Amino acid sequence: MAYNWWVIRVLCNKSLEEVIFWRLDSFGCRGTASQIQGKNCLVLAYLPEEQTQLLDLSALSLNFRQDALCMNFPVPIMDWYLIEEEDWASSWKQYWQPQEIGDHFLIHPAWLDLPEQSDKIILRLDPGAAFGTGTHPTTQLCLESLEMRLGLEPHPEAIIADIGCGSGILSIGAALLGVHQIYAVDIDPLAIRSTINNGKLNQIKAEKLIVEQGDIKKLIKLCPKPVDGIVCNILAEVIIDIIPHLTAIAKPKTWGIISGILLEQAKLIGDTLEQNGWVVATLWKKEEWCCFNIRYS
């Protein structure tokens, strides 16, 4: 039996992209993509027809409006329409092309042929319904920070933790940069599946990338000893709650890469980090977003 799918399109300011993704994920959407259009961003998402009603879609549009007004951005434009099942899984993929990030990474959609020659570290990705294609400034900042932190030399004993792994892009990036062991968690089961599948796409061994569904408390139980590094690219409101727990997996000189944070939220995050024993080494910025590079003292 064929099913129909809602296509939800949201045209918004680029700085709202992560909030839009979060709303769509919470709404139950499967498969998301985004395309930068000047100062704006076109976000697409898909939802089974039977899973929602028109009134629910209208309420979602109102949530987008309220988010934008609270953050002093223009109100997003949202519309929706139905397509048949065989079209939904691939229709969003036309909006996503290979993208270079930093000095060494090439994020490459899994359904496209690999380049015949490349001097880049090719990270193959099929995000499915999980957040993290490499197009968002916070993901780019995190990958660039990983490059800076790890370089291109192997790290045969290094262990890192990934909080809110999404598509697995940061965990896999770390593995491709030579990290020995990665522990990753996400509360979304679709993200867990996506991270595992993308690990296989990039020939990362399952024992190297340990992925479990859960929150920071699950991660603390998962890590057998303090880690060398922590990556976390999620909403600032969640980061605030997580920071006091980070010491449970940290040791002196553990480094961290923390993003998902608007510039206007940076002071609160920075103050909270310092109150919990972390030193802010650098603060990187891209558009309206920032990334903390930190160290545990």
From Swiss-Prot:
Pfam families: PrmA (PF06325)
Keyword Transferase attributed: yes
Gene3D superfamilies tied to this protein: Vaccinia Virus protein VP39
Subcellular location, principal: cytoplasm
Cellular component annotations (GO), alphabetically ordered: cytoplasm
Protein location: Cytoplasm
InterPro entries listed in its UniProt record: Ribosomal_L11_MeTrfase_PrmA, Ribosomal_PrmA_MeTrfase, SAM-dependent_MTases_sf
GO molecular function, one term: protein-lysine N-methyltransferase activity
Signal peptide residue numbers: none
HAMAP family reported in the protein's UniProt record: Methyltr_PrmA (MF_00735)
Family: Belongs to the methyltransferase superfamily. PrmA family.
Function: Methylates ribosomal protein L11.
Name of the protein in question: Ribosomal protein L11 methyltransferase
Lineage: Bacteria, Bacillati, Cyanobacteriota, Cyanophyceae, Oscillatoriophycideae
Protein encoded by which gene: prmA
